[in-house]
Amino acid sequence: MVRPQLDDPLSCQRLLDQLKDLHEAGLRHLEVAWSSHAGWRRFVQEIQECCPRFALGAASVVAIEALDDLQSLDLAYAMAPCWDPALVGAARDLGQLLIPGVLSPTEVQQTTAFGCRLVKLFPAATVGVAYWKRLEAPLGPLPFVIAAGGLTTIDLSAWLGAGHDAIALGRRAIGDHGVDPVLLGWLNRS
């Protein structure tokens, strides 16, 4: 997940260059934190042009107005940091995949009852690597889960090994220092 500094063209260009490196290394899914900023759509379009193999999504979607941007840019999916049934329902009505964020057993149960087969455990680092499996005994079969929030490249093997279906990395994997070399190595091996 990337969160571009849309008021800083140099920062955006550096980020695009880093995304090209990740694209070439084989990264397949990328989320760009949604913003109502006028430059957000243009930034996403630039990624679509220079990295056509990315399945692009929007992260941090908490407003229904974001759904218009998702639709006009033909984004593959969106992720929310929280469980908002009205937002998930509105996305469904538009034929869009919005992955809700969950943390508590109640949220996991509610999203499952709502028909969500894919959820984002957020913030995952707060609850630890064993948390998700502990929910299985009281709740039964759990949905496909993407662990996100506070995780780094060092966490990849442990979290995937503990049964999380996917990991979303954020600012620590890419930033002013460049792309984390551990991530590039991991992508090149997979």
Enumerate the predicted regions with their spans.
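Glycine-rich beta-to-alpha transition loops that act as phosphate-gripper elements at the mouths
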Residues: 1-7, 58-64, 80-83, 100-105, ...
